[in-house]
Swiss-Prot record:
Residues 365-374, 390-405 have a biased composition (Basic residues). Residues 7-16 have a biased composition (Polar residues). It comes from the Viruses. This is Uncharacterized protein R505. Residues 1-21, 150-179, 285-405 are annotated as: Disordered. Residues 312-331, 349-358 have a biased composition (Acidic residues). It comes from Acanthamoeba polyphaga mimivirus.
């Protein structure tokens, strides 16, 4: 099969220097001009590298295709361990992107036509014989344009439960009712660096009329940038034909197909429906703080209590001055702070000295009560002496009590 080259769509030249990178638009590649190298049978697969005989340059170039704008309404980079992608455990299992071929989008339709032409060309009996010779019947071509498999839901009850779980997991993946959307599976350009795989697919973010290159070393970092509903453009490299060395489990023939890589992605980020932990931030606690301030007034109350204590100390100093004038009132004031019952006892002492003496004898069981009673007797008997020397009253009050005892 052959396909005419569209002369109106000339290849892109990045510069006029001796080294030029030629990029083609879809539907401009003539499959008959594809040059296929000999098989390299080293490694896990056979590989035959591809070049393109450019009719305008009369030289071999790489098969680099640039797409028009494609919106990621479907497919994209698979998620880890969700729904139909439950077998994906890490980034190593998803080093590719499914480029959707959404019906009605010019960029998708143009890309689909180009890859359908490639699939038709390389799956032909003539090409299979050219590649594998007498073993041609033992190989089956895997198309680049793929149709998602739809699981039959009319199975057992357990299958119904699994289907429900998958529906929940794939609810927000952009799937719509109607026929399944086809896609092209293209691998990211990954290289080995100190035992780790590093992405070399170029990411160019387009936003607000400005373009900037974004560094993304891992598939997770790519997925965080090229999200669902992003508007994307791709530079794709059809670089080789690969062929399996053995028959896969459940298959009857060995598989072969084209190798497709994504070399660059220009994208305008879409509105994300998921959560990105990097964008999470705590709100201010202004409202909560206002509620907390109310109970924190308790230390103010304690300060007020301290002030009251200071005031009481000042009052005590004033009372000491009053003691010099009238000591009996001071003793009644102290006894009133201890208990109301003692006030009544003191008043009775002032009214009746004999009853006071009886109460003193009753309270002699405790040392504190005996001392207070002796002080009261001394104050009643020696009023003049206490008024003359109020500051040394406590010491003189104790001495006569000891002499009497």
């Amino acid at each position: 099969m052959s396909k005419k080259v569209n002369k109106n769509a000339s290849p892109k030249n990045n510069s006029d220097s001796e080294s030029k990178t030629i990029i083609y638009r879809p539907n401009t590649i003539d499959c008959d001009r594809i040059d296929i190298a000999d098989w390299n049978k080293d490694g896990k697969q056979w590989n035959a590298w591809l070049n393109y005989q450019d009719p305008n340059l009369n030289s071999n170039t790489k098969i680099l295709l640039q797409t028009k704008t494609i919106e990621l309404k479907h497919h994209g980079i698979p998620r880890i361990g969700e729904g139909e992608d439950a077998f994906i455990k890490s980034d190593a299992d998803r080093e590719y992107i499914k480029i959707p071929l959404t019906p009605g989008e010019p960029g998708c339709e143009e890309l689909e036509q180009q890859f359908q032409a490639l699939d038709e060309y390389f799956s032909s009996d003539e090409m299979r014989t050219k590649l594998f010779g007498k073993r041609a019947n033992g190989y089956k071509y895997v198309t680049c344009v793929k149709t998602p498999k739809i699981k039959d839901e009319s199975d057992s009850d357990s299958d119904d439960e699994d289907t429900k779980k998958k529906k929940k997991n794939t609810k927000n993946k952009g799937k719509q009712e109607g026929p399944p959307v086809k896609y092209i599976k293209a691998k990211f350009h990954m290289i080995q660096d100190n035992g780790k795989k590093i992405n070399r697919t170029k990411l160019i973010k387009s936003s607000g009329g400005k373009k900037e290159e974004v560094n993304a070393d891992t598939v997770t970092e790519i997925a965080n940038e090229v999200r669902f509903l992003s508007k994307t453009k791709y530079i794709m490299h059809v670089n080789r034909i690969w062929a399996a060395k053995s028959v896969l489990l459940g298959a009857d023939k060995k598989m072969y197909s084209l190798g497709v890589k994504v070399m660059a992605i220009e994208y305008t980020p879409g509105a994300s429906t998921g959560l990105n932990s990097k964008n999470l931030a705590f709100m201010s606690d202004d409202e909560d703080e206002e509620e907390v301030v109310k109970p924190t007034k308790s230390p103010n109350k304690s300060s007020q209590k301290q002030k009251q204590k200071l005031d009481s100390d000042d009052e005590d100093s004033d009372n000491e001055k009053e003691k010099e004038k009238e000591e009996d009132d001071e003793e009644e004031h102290k006894s009133s702070n201890k208990s109301s019952n003692k006030k009544s006892k003191k008043q009775d002492d002032d009214e009746d000295d004999e009853e006071e003496g009886e109460k003193i004898e009753v309270k002699k069981s405790s040392k504190k009560s005996s001392k207070k009673a002796s002080k009261k007797q001394d104050s009643d008997e020696e009023d003049e002496e206490e008024v003359a020397k109020p500051k040394k009253k406590s010491s003189k009050a104790k001495s006569p009590s000891k002499s009497r005892s």
